[in-house]
Amino acid sequence: MKIVRVTPLPLSCRSANGPMTFFVVRIETDDGLVGYGESCDCFGVSFPAVHAAVVRDAFAPLLVGRELIAVAPLVDELRVSTRRQLGQSWASAQARSAIEIALWDLVGQDAGRSVSAILGRVRDTIPVYAGSSPFLDDHDAAFHLDRLTPMLERGVRHVKLRTGPDSDRAVDVLADLRRLLGRDVEIMVDASESLDLPTTARISDRMAELDVRWLEEPLLQSRHSAVAAAAARSRVPIAAGEHLFSTEEALAALVAGEISVIQPDPCISGGIAEAREIAGLAAGFGARAVLHYHAGLVGLGAVLQVAACAPGVDLLEYPVHLDTVLRTQSGGDELGISAIVDGRLALPDRPGIGVAPLASVLSESLIS
């Protein structure tokens, strides 16, 4: 099948927290198939027009007219052909991830099989954790419990909260929340690269007493020696992955001892195959593999395909506020919070990535 059209789609959709922006790519073939992919920069896509420009100006001309026989050669050509001009990380890698996902969607549809079936499906459901975006230090424990309740009621027993500018206050609130949740719910904390080494050491000691299962991105991921020092000192496992843009970068972080929980995301790290490969590195370093997700419907479809074919993955992020986005883009509740049963989400096994956004919603959400 031949690629005939590559269309970048910068989108704006309303989440439970308010408007968010996203980036989706649509790829069409000469036999009428349509594949979708999505990128992410950790929280939707803050500058979707940038990703659109990368796809429109750099990637699309390399793809239109090409035969889609296998995904990897085309994606590698995008990387090699543009790396000296665009680099191999950040917006370039994120936009390339969207392309890779869309190509896999097409390959799966053409074969009449899910991507995970092609790559080796190992499970049909995955446990999820509730990701809550408001800062711990901005509200009391009762507020945070209320935010988490819809997912706790669906049997979810893993939750992640975020620290804000007042990290000590955040841990105080976390202690109150731990008392409300009891010890049957696992708690994780995301610092969003906001701390320094002394603060990381201090609050990780306090978090260890609260049985926090990981502290995510306490420092800028680019400060490798500092991250490694924090990991060596912390009594709580250090997690990261949403700023790792390739298997090579993930391997370097694991070798350096920077992380013990790795969090690949196919919308960031190069696509479905790359995220699966990154997840596969974890066991060799005694690390845990947990999938990051913070995009829209197409992104979740890609993440779920990785979850279905990556044997070492044991947990998947599910941001509470994205339920609204998922229901809007799909026109149903199949992947909304109400679809979570006993804390687990079913993994689609339809051809391709198993999901497709409503064309009408894409048109209405398109940023001109």
Where are these regions (language model features)?
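Conserved, mostly hydrophobic/aromatic
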Residues: 32, 59, 99, 112, ...
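Shared catalytic-loop signature of beta/alpha-barrel
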Residues: 54-57, 87, 205, 211, ...
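Short, glycine/acidic-enriched loop or turn micro-motifs at the edges of active sites
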Residues: 41, 163, 192-195, 219-220, ...
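Structured beta-strand/loop patches that form or line metal/cofactor-binding pockets in enzymes
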Residues: 1-44, 325-327
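Metal- or metallocofactor-binding catalytic centers and their adjacent structured scaffolds
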Residues: 28-110
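Metal-dependent enolase-superfamily TIM-barrel catalytic cores that perform enediolate-based chemistry
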Residues: 117-234
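Extended hydrophobic packing segments that form well-structured cores
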Residues: 351-368
